[in-house]
Amino acid sequence: ASALTRSHVADFLVESGVCVNRKKVFKRYLNKGGKAHVPAEWCSMSTAIGAIKGAGGIAILAHPGRYPLNRAKLKRLVDTFRQVGGEALEASYPNIAPEMKQYLEKLGVEFSMYLSCGSDFHDAAATWTDVGKLPALSSEVAAQVVWQHPVWKARVDAI
């Protein structure tokens, strides 16, 4: 099963000739202030984590360095995420500043969390990211990489 997303709507509007490209669709219609913008309804952090873990997944805080938070607030977010059952932190992704990557790795160590990395790929039409193009995690955190998590290892062993 698949879900209809804003990207599908953008593609439809481009294909229909309403806009010349996706960027214009998002700016004019889908982003905040746009004619067709619908605010997201978010569940609580603990509800999301429960759903992820209930489905057999690993709850990972995605690209936390991109949130508009100072370091004290970011640390509080990571602490709260961990307290409500989050297990991992994405510490590397495209265009991350080296200092932020190092800080996220430090937070992962401090809070005894697994660390992940990802190219933040959303769909093939996205031009702002390339699959797999991101800085590697530091060798100092090799024992904490998410693929060392028991859930991950069990899935790999089952293949």
Language-model regions, residue ranges each:
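Non-catalytic alpha-helical scaffold/packing segments enriched in small hydrophobic residues
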Residues: 8, 12, 44-51, 76-77
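Short acidic/polar alpha-helix capping motifs at helix-coil junctions
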Residues: 10-16, 40-44, 66-72
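Charged catalytic cores and adjacent phosphate/nucleic-acid-binding surfaces used
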Residues: 20, 49-61, 65-159
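A mid-sequence, solvent-exposed acidic-amphipathic segment
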Residues: 35-56
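Extended, charge-rich helix/loop segments that form flexible
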Residues: 1-28
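Surface-exposed cleft-lining segments at the edges of enzyme active sites
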Residues: 27-39, 91
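Short, mixed-charge, low-aromatic patches
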Residues: 2-7, 36-38, 58-63, 102
